[in-house]
């Protein structure tokens, strides 16, 4: 019962989206709407993921400690011997990367922004406290639903401010304490230079005479306000003018005038009414206009007694001293008393607490057990994997959970286990750090398919795999120049083989800037790409039509082979079939030609390197771990078997390719030079043309029989 009772001042979780993390808010008010619903007026807290990366870097810089140390014992205590150094919190250094990652999820940023949310969206309580340097950082991780903050975030201005003042430590900020005087020792300092006397307690006047003089001073102040046009507008009545003349500013000036005239009342009255007219003394209450007073009340309602923020955002033309002085005078007015009574009456009529039952509705991101089917690859399930097991958890990489939740973009089909989903909703991140944040253990290899692709739990094999979003890298001229000038730093071949390794672009840019003056003496020749206009290309295609490709001339050997029975030489494709309709590698990589004919070509297994492989029936190969069936109908060169057409889906991804090298291909590989091998690897779509000198040697003829005598067979 108490856990579901929410009061003003509680820190709570709010859910605004079924897939996003909870919002963290502090309840300021509970209001009942006209239709009977309860709305909560809350203060917003922001996570690290909600603000920009530049402000995150600023917050991390603020978290460093400024350690002041001296050059050594006995050194000068002045500013020369004091050195400031920014170091990382030593406690953060000792924490492992996983705890550092989780500690960042506990950091929040306070804001002055208020918003109203339905109370039915509350999903639980949490605790938020100001960061305490005396507490251990691990203590925040040991407590459940516990957060801390140290900076204030302004979502409109996109700025960060410190929420508390800082105590300045050092000789420049601390007072020098003199030694204690001994018994009977006199102070050698001149006291007249250290203090100023403004009132003499033992003066010749009695209290009655002083009170009468103060009454005269009030009367002079009232008369001066009657003569002043601006004051007559602000205090239109005599009663208000007399009240303004009776404030402390008038009395302090009268007593100061009496002290300066050596407590001679007649001289003091003459000083109050000089030749030009009576003296008018105004305080902050009279100096401020009505519009400025309204701005101050609005700022006080939003920021409270944070006078620095009030000055910066509402009254920048006023000094901080003036604002503080006006505040304490404003508290003595009738308007302040009336507002205080009105707020107290409103607080009595408002709700103090509200009961919100537990939210038991199913989350739309839940993955139902009926939709999880056993993953089938090439007609067989993954060995050692239980039916229903799919992709592992993106956070902890577990494959066992009583409930799964879809997470991330829908096309990625990522999911989280129940424990990591609760952590994601509360803390706005994953338990384990990613490779961008630090070390992260690799995925569970038991959850991989035979081709190394994670098996997805989807009802239809058409959506078993999704392609990643493509990108286009547009390089500038300076980037292309830097590739040549800083080749030993950039190491382009190494970077191409390891695209996931980061490149220090700042160091390369600095080195390129330093080498540019020397390189200007021998300028680099960049290849200029001249693109012809579209009209010129169309005219060329009209004048040079492509001739039709002639049919290949069949040789006598091919004619004889077409008449061979089907069982004589079955053609085996050594590439493993894919789960996407058993399509070959060439179909996925866009080789020119008719797709239907290409699927039926007997040399499709090695078409990329221009070699046709024919295997006799004597060699029994394995296909997907099973022996190839002997009763296989051979596909003749010009025949087209009834193949079920399947349209290629643009979101389907090709399967991995397994290339099995034979003795013949190894011999061909030895005939190629290293440059030709590398060129073929960089351009796998181009066929390899072997020169006649590189042709394979013919097999020697069979040896002649040893016995030359004829063999006679008698009946």
Swiss-Prot record:
User: Which positions hold the covalent cross-link Glycyl lysine isopeptide (Lys-Gly) (interchain with G-Cter in SUMO2)?
Assistant: 549
In the record, Phosphothreonine modifications are located at 564, 578
PTM comment text: Phosphorylation by CSNK1G2/CK1 triggered by estrogen enhances corepression of estrogen receptor (ER).
Enumerate the InterPro entries for this protein.
BAH_dom, BAH_sf, ELM2_dom, Homeodomain-like_sf, MIER/MTA, MTA1_R1, SANT/Myb, SANT_dom
What does the record say about the knockout?
Mice exhibit a disruption of the free-running period of circadian rhythms under constant light and normal entrainment of behavior to light-dark (LD) cycles.
Region entry Interaction with RBBP4, spans: 656-686
Q: In which tissues is it expressed?
A: Widely expressed but not in skeletal muscle. Highly expressed in the brain, liver, kidney and cardiac muscle and in mammary tumors.
- Where the record annotates domain SANT, the positions are 283-335
PROSITE patterns linked: BAH (PS51038), ELM2 (PS51156), SANT (PS51293)
The answer on whether this UniProt entry bears the keyword Zinc reads: yes
Q: Name one GO cellular component term.
A: nucleoplasm
Please list the GO biological process terms of this entry. chromatin remodeling; circadian regulation of gene expression; double-strand break repair; entrainment of circadian clock by photoperiod; locomotor rhythm; negative regulation of DNA-templated transcription; negative regulation of gene expression, epigenetic; positive regulation of DNA-templated transcription
What's the short name of a Pfam family annotated to this entry? BAH
Any one Gene Ontology molecular-function term assigned to this protein's record = zinc ion binding
Sequence ranges of Basic and acidic residues compositional bias: 542-552
Q: Give the position of the cross-link Glycyl lysine isopeptide (Lys-Gly) (interchain with G-Cter in ubiquitin).
A: 182, 626
Q: Where is this region: Disordered?
A: 437-460, 542-590, 673-715
Sequence motif: SUMO interaction motif 1 (SIM), positions: 711-715
Locations listed in the record: Nucleus; Nucleus envelope; Cytoplasm; Cytoplasm, Cytoskeleton
Residues covered by the ELM2 domain: 165-276
On subunit structure and binding partners, the annotation says:
Component of the nucleosome remodeling and deacetylase (NuRD) repressor complex, composed of core proteins MTA1, MTA2, MTA3, RBBP4, RBBP7, HDAC1, HDAC2, MBD2, MBD3, and peripherally associated proteins CDK2AP1, CDK2AP2, GATAD2A, GATAD2B, CHD3, CHD4 and CHD5. The exact stoichiometry of the NuRD complex is unknown, and some subunits such as MBD2 and MBD3, GATAD2A and GATAD2B, and CHD3, CHD4 and CHD5 define mutually exclusive NuRD complexes. Interacts with RBBP4; the interaction is direct. Interacts with BMAL1. Interacts with CLOCK. Interacts with COP1. Interacts with CSNK1G2 in the cytoplasm.
Q: Which family does it belong to?
A: Belongs to the metastasis-associated protein family.
The name this protein goes by in its record: Metastasis-associated protein MTA1
Organism name: Mus musculus
């Amino acid at each position: 019962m108490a856990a579901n009772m929410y009061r003003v001042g509680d820190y709570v979780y709010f859910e605004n989206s079924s897939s996003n993390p909870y919002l963290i808010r502090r309840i300021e008010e509970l209001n009942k709407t006209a239709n009977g619903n309860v709305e909560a007026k809350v203060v917003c807290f922001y996570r690290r993921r909600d603000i920009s990366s530049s402000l995150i870097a600023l917050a991390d810089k603020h978290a460093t400690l400024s350690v002041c140390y001296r050059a050594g014992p006995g050194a000068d205590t002045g500013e020369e011997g004091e050195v400031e150094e920014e170091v990382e919190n030593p406690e953060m250094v000792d924490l492992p990367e996983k705890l550092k990652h989780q500690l960042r999820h506990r950091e929040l940023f306070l804001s002055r922004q208020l918003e109203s949310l339905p109370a039915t969206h509350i999903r639980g309580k949490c605790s938020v406290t100001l960061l305490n340097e005396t507490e251990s950082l691990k203590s925040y991780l040991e407590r459940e639903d516990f957060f801390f903050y140290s900076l204030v975030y302004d979502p409109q201005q996109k700025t960060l401010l410190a929420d508390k003042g800082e105590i300045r430590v050092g000789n420049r900020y601390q007072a020098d304490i003199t030694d204690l005087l001994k018994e009977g020792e006199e102070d050698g300092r001149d006291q007249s230079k250290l203090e100023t006397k403004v009132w003499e307690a033992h003066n010749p006047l009695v209290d009655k005479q002083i009170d009468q003089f103060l009454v005269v001073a009030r009367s002079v102040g009232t008369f001066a306000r009657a003569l002043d046009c601006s004051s007559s507008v602000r205090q239109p009545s005599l009663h208000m003018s007399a009240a303004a003349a009776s404030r402390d500013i008038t009395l302090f000036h009268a007593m100061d005038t009496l002290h300066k005239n050596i407590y001679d009342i007649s001289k003091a009255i003459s000083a109050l009414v000089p030749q030009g007219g009576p003296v008018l003394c105004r305080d902050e209450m009279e100096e401020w206009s009505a519009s400025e007073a309204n701005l101050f009340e609005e700022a006080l309602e939003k920021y409270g007694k944070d006078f620095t923020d009030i000055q910066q955002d509402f009254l920048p033309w006023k000094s901080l001293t003036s604002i503080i002085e006006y505040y304490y005078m404003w508290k003595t007015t009738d308007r302040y008393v009336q507002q205080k009574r009105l707020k107290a009456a409103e607080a009595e009529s408002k709700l103090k607490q509200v009961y919100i039952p537990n939210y038991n509705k199913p989350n739309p991101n839940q993955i139902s057990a009926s939709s999880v089917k056993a993953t089938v690859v090439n007609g067989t399930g993954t060995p050692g994997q239980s039916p229903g097991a799919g992709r592992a958890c993106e956070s902890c990489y577990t494959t066992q959970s009583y409930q799964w939740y879809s997470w991330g973009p829908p096309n990625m089909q990522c999911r989280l286990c129940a424990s990591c989903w609760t952590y994601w909703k509360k803390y706005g991140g994953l338990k384990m750090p990613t490779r961008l944040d630090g070390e992260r253990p690799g995925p569970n290899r038991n959850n991989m398919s035979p081709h190394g692709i994670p098996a997805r739990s989807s009802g239809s094999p058409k959506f078993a795999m999704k392609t990643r979003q493509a990108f286009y890298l547009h390089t500038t001229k300076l980037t292309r120049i830097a590739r040549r000038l800083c080749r030993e730093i950039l190491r382009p071949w190494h970077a191409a083989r390891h695209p996931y390794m980061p490149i220090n672009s700042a160091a390369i840019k600095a080195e390129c800037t330093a080498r540019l003056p020397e390189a200007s003496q021998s300028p680099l020749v960049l290849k200029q790409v001249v693109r012809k206009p579209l009209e010129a290309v169309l005219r060329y295609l009209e004048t040079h039509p492509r001739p039709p490709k002639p049919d290949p001339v069949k040789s006598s050997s091919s004619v004889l082979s077409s008449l061979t029975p089907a069982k004589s030489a079955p053609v085996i494709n050594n590439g493993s079939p894919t789960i996407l309709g058993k399509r070959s590698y060439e179909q996925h990589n866009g080789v020119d030609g008719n797709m239907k004919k290409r699927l039926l070509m007997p040399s499709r297994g090695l078409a990329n390197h221009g070699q046709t492989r024919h295997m006799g029936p004597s060699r029994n190969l394995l296909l997907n771990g099973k022996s190839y069936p002997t009763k296989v109908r051979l596909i003749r060169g010009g025949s087209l078997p009834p193949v079920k057409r399947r349209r290629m889906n643009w979101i389907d991804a090709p399967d991995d390719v397994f290339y099995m090298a034979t003795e013949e291909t190894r011999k061909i590989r030895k005939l190629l030079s290293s440059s030709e091998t590398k060129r073929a690897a960089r351009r796998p779509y181009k066929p390899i043309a072997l020169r006649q000198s590189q042709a394979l040697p013919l097999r020697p003829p069979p040896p002649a029989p040893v016995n030359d005598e004829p063999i006679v067979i008698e009946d």
